[in-house]
Amino acid sequence: MRFFVFTCLLAVALAKNGIEQRSASEEIVSFYQEKYKQDSNAAIYPTNQETPSVSSSEESVEVQTEKDEQIEEENVYLKQLKRIKQIFQKFYIPQYPEVYQQQIVMNPWKHVKTTTYPVPIPETTRIPLEEIVKKIVEMIKFNQLHQFVIPQYVQALQQRIAMNPWHHVTPFRSFPVLNF
């Protein structure tokens, strides 16, 4: 009982400590993020005091141009990815190094002569998903038809005790038993 109470108190204390550390670390992170934003704004953009006020329509135009630029960059990036994908689809790159079949020929002078012949790698063929599904269905039907059924007569047989010829039980005793 004491151990249970102790573990509960310890868990509560650790949870409070973790929450306090998280809140402190979150405050530090937010402070540095604000400081970074202020530094980056000061370095790149002048502060609001230095620039005259800009109307809301001009700000919305700037925001839209920035969004358009981001969309264009994303489109260019996607086009480049598509080109790279098309280039790699043209080339067949094997996943494993080529296997060479070695033939060993014994010379009469007890020297081993080895020759290597490249094993032809067949081109990969793509099988449609429908054919794969058909094959799976056929295999399931085949397995259902040819299931091995245990015959019922095997279960009905009684177990017999194996007899040992050295411990043969005789119906008659070799010595008389006296009952008083």
UniProtKB/Swiss-Prot annotation:
Important role in the capacity of milk to transport calcium phosphate. GO terms for cellular component: extracellular space. The keyword Phosphoprotein applies. This is Alpha-S2-casein-like A. The modification Phosphoserine is found at residues 23, 25. PANTHER family: ALPHA-S2-CASEIN-LIKE A, ALPHA-S2-CASEIN-LIKE B. Its main location: secreted. Keywords: Milk protein, Phosphoprotein, Secreted, Signal. Residues 1-15 form the signal peptide. Belongs to the alpha-casein family. It is found in: Secreted. One of its GO terms (molecular function) is zymogen binding. Residues 46-66 are annotated as: Disordered. Mammary gland specific. Secreted in milk. InterPro entries: Alpha-s2_casein, Casein_CS. The gene is CSN1S2A.
